[in-house]
Amino acid sequence: MERKEKGMGIKARRLLAYIVLIIISILCLVWFYILFINATRSKGELTQGFTAIPSTHAWENWTNVYNGSIPIFRGMLNSLIIALSSAAVSTYFSTMTAYAIHAYDFRIKNAVFTFILMIMTIPTQVTALGFLELVQKMKLEDNYIPLIVPTIAAPVTFFYMKQYMDSVLPLSLIEAARIDGAGAFRIFNQIVVPLMKPAIAVQAIFTFVSSWTNYFTPALILHEEKMKTLPILIAQLRSADFLKFDMGQVYMMIAFSIFPVIVIYLVLSKYIVGGVTLGGVKG
């Protein structure tokens, strides 16, 4: 009887967990639904308030965006170059840094680890002025480099990689590879990186999304129309003259801009559950 009651208690908790997860999922997806609904509505319809039923102006909104003065495809290309490069650079070098802290013993190891974590507490806005002055002195305005190279130093990505590495990479495996004559870079690229694929995929998604949606830093550096990213172009569209302002076009452009994010997520999402679970459990 007691075992039966215990089993029913587990089922009740599981059912409650599923209900909560379903509610959270609906709350997350409803905003995407509203976005796509609004992308199908005209300027006049949007002023009448919210409706859950799609309208018939999607093609009209897309035509207006496509034929407008804003270079959306060039903006998407710029965003893709920056976001993909940032994701690759950030995850690879953060994994390498985490491996150095994990696998090697040196005198200031703990101090270095603490210093890297302290950097996480510094907001981007605090260092923006100095960063902009440095970019101007190096004559790197309207260039991808200042938006990609700094992602090498990504404390949040490093911390996640270090925690994940602690759970899946025993030092005995590294020692065995060293005994077999493998060098440091061979161990890292052929043993560590394959083991870290779930964590790399998770952080690649997060870094890609963060870079893709970043408006603040690109707006400081990119001024030429052909170099601007999608968030800057969307902001330009929103700040247009009131008489020419069409919110339907804005919603359509936002909907257009999130498709690459959805594709990246669908491609790499299978790693998220495994990556988060293994990264958060020691041993």
Predicted segments, located by residue:
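A structural signal for multi-pass alpha-helical bundles of membrane permease subunits
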Residues: 5-7, 13-283
